[in-house]
Curated annotation (Swiss-Prot):
UniProt name for this protein: Dihydromonacolin L monooxygenase LovA
Organism whose genome encodes this protein: Aspergillus terreus (strain NIH 2624 / FGSC A1156)
Lineage, highest ranks first: Eukaryota, Fungi, Dikarya, Ascomycota, Pezizomycotina
Cofactor note: Binds 1 heme group per subunit.
Biotechnology and industry use: Lovastatin acts as a hypolipidemic agent that works as inhibitor of (3S)-hydroxymethylglutaryl-coenzyme A (HMG-CoA) reductase (HMGR) which reduces HMG-CoA to mevalonate and is the key step in cholesterol biosynthesis. Lovastatin, simvastatin and related compounds are widely used to treat hypercholesteremia and reduce the risk of cardiovascular disease. Furthermore, statins such as lovastatin were found to be anticancer agents.
Entry GO terms, CC: endoplasmic reticulum membrane
Phenotypic effect of disruption: Loss of lovastatin biosynthesis. Accelerates degradation of lovastatin precursors.
């Protein structure tokens, strides 16, 4: 079910174009006039070849700006994209909040992902205003050193044997704290609870136990991403030349900068303390202590070169909390809506974790749980078009599709619901990928953390989400505890709802489930 944006609670409504009303009567006329005059000037002064693709949501001849078209895209994007690509295997252009965007069918994804002229970092830096104070996380993401990508791709992989068990132990305590021990059936706001669970668990591995239990840091980790998304969207309403000025006048801009300042105040002393400890040990010829968290891994990877430690951590929170939460909640809800899965999943968890404990190898062996999650991601991807990138120069695909320099381009997720690829695509089949793993030719791509052209929920290598390996491990840990410790069922007469806005398709924040404590827990090897 799609929920109309006008019925959303305030924290969601603030993400919509209705936010312009919050700025008083001066805001809309000023932005409309400014944007219109600037667009007209740019159009008259522009030269070079333009795209010949049709625009799905064009502005009419009497409209001075594209504001109405952008607003319509935000409200209708998932249904428009699904409608177009269910009937057409060819590109289409849309007017989106950042300008024109060419969306390609997934049949062009293989060629798209290999094009170096299409830059994802340019998208992140441009649409999230990396040059402005408060967006420090995106400034660090888009630095030429690409330190964050290196840490996520290398350290989070090689250090997994060291962090899986302590992370599972931390998640165990957090789950008890959040979900409680009541053995009576009761309704819980599972979206909010899972968001808190992911925030606290991610923070533990990002900044270590000291900050992971600091309520002020947890509040920043949880809310900075939302503040940043709101402000980024509001700034995209304005002509580029005016955005720095507007950013200093907007209340959200002030809030964003304050969050970054406080994050630095909390994190910098820990960084300095660790560096002093390291230098002191080395001066004495002693091996410095090593911490199992991303602070350590950033220090190792930077090798003494400067980087923005606070910006890096805020970027990691932005990337690691909300996407992970959506898949965790979506996976749990899908399992609960198919209660015949509960015991087979519990049997798998008992056997695998009971025999092997918390190790990367054990998490790999949770094949049914892995299949359930990958199917949840296929049925409801987090975005209806993914791998957004900007053209660094004019680009022409082999089929003649032309993308002008500076234009946004993305790939539709249409293949994930294509009946020629997936039998009964609308059906949630939890064993779908488990069966595929029995075929040696498909076993690799059938795993949640691996990508191919038939399933781009995490993108497609080399444009895939670099944090998917960690997210896969983390989600399986949390779900294992949630399924073993608690009974679950749906709330009667409460259908599953999604929040659809622009490219995003998310589990609705008002989602609830019923639960109660079971008289069982995960028993590790050697336990009684």
């Amino acid at each position: 079910m799609t929920v109309d944006a006008l019925t959303q609670p305030h924290h969601l409504l603030s993400l919509a174009w209705n936010d312009t009303q919050q700025h008083g009567s001066w805001f809309a006329p000023l932005v409309t006039t400014s944007a219109g005059l600037l667009c007209l000037l740019l159009y008259l002064c522009s030269s070079g070849r333009r795209s010949e693709l049709p625009v799905f949501n064009p502005k009419t001849w009497w409209e001075l700006t594209t504001m109405r078209a952008k607003r319509d895209f935000d409200a209708n994007a998932p249904s428009w994209i699904e409608s177009w690509f269910s009937q057409n295997d060819k590109p289409i252009r849309f007017i989106v909040d950042s300008g024109y965007c060419t969306i390609l069918p997934s049949s062009m994804a293989d060629e798209f992902r290999k094009m170096k002229e299409l830059c994802m970092y340019k998208f992140l830096g441009t649409d999230f205003h990396s040059h402005l104070p408060g967006f420090d996380g995106f400034k660090e993401v888009t630095r030429d050193a690409h330190l964050i990508t290196k840490v996520v791709m290398n350290q989070f992989q090689t250090q997994a044997p060291k962090y899986v068990k302590p992370l599972a132990n931390e998640a165990s305590g957090i789950i008890t704290d959040i979900f409680g021990d009541s053995n009576e059936w009761h309704t819980v706001p599972v979206y909010n609870q899972c968001l808190d669970l992911v925030t606290r668990t991610v923070t533990f591995i990002m900044v270590g136990s000291k900050l992971a239990h600091n309520e002020e840091w947890l509040d920043i980790a949880k809310h900075h991403a939302v503040t940043m998304a709101i402000q980024a969207r509001q700034l995209r309403l304005w002509p580029v030349i005016l955005r720095p000025l507007v950013h200093w006048l907007e209340p959200q801009g002030a809030k964003l900068r304050a969050q970054v300042r406080r994050a630095r105040q909390l994190l910098d002393p820990i960084i300095q303390e660790r560096r002093a400890e390291r230098d002191s040990c080395l001066a004495k010829g002693i091996e410095p202590p090593r911490y199992v968290d991303s602070i350590q891994w950033f220090e190792d990877t930077a090798k003494g070169k400067w980087y923005d430690a606070a910006g890096a951590q805020l970027a990691m929170d932005f990337a690691g909390i909300y996407g992970t939460s959506d898949l965790l909640i979506g996976g749990l809800v899908d399992i609960v809506r198919h209660p015949h899965l509960l015991e087979p999943l519990r049997d798998e968890i008992r056997t695998v974790i009971g025999q092997g404990g918390w190790t990367p190898a054990s998490l790999y062996k949770l094949k049914l749980l892995d299949s359930c999650l990958k199917e949840s991601q296929r049925v409801k991807p987090v975005e209806c078009a993914t791998m957004r990138s900007y053209a660094l120069q004019d680009v022409t695909f082999s089929n003649g599709t032309f993308i002008p320099k500076g234009e946004l381009v993305a790939v539709a997720a249409d293949r994930m619901s294509n009946p020629e690829v997936w039998p009964e695509p609308a059906k949630y089949d939890p064993y779908r990928y488990m069966r595929l793993r029995e075929d040696p030719a498909k076993a690799f791509s059938a795993q949640l953390e691996n990508t191919n052209g038939d399933h781009i929920g995490f993108g497609w290598h080399p444009r895939a989400c670099p944090g998917r390996f960690f997210a896969s491990k983390e989600i399986k840990m949390m779900l294992a505890y949630l399924l073993i410790r608690y009974d679950w069922k749906v709330v009667p007469n409460e259908p599953l709802q999604y929040y659809r806005h622009s490219f995003s398709v998310r589990i609705h924040p008002t989602t609830k489930l019923m639960m109660r404590r079971r008289d069982e827990d995960i028993r590790l090897p050697g336990s009684l």
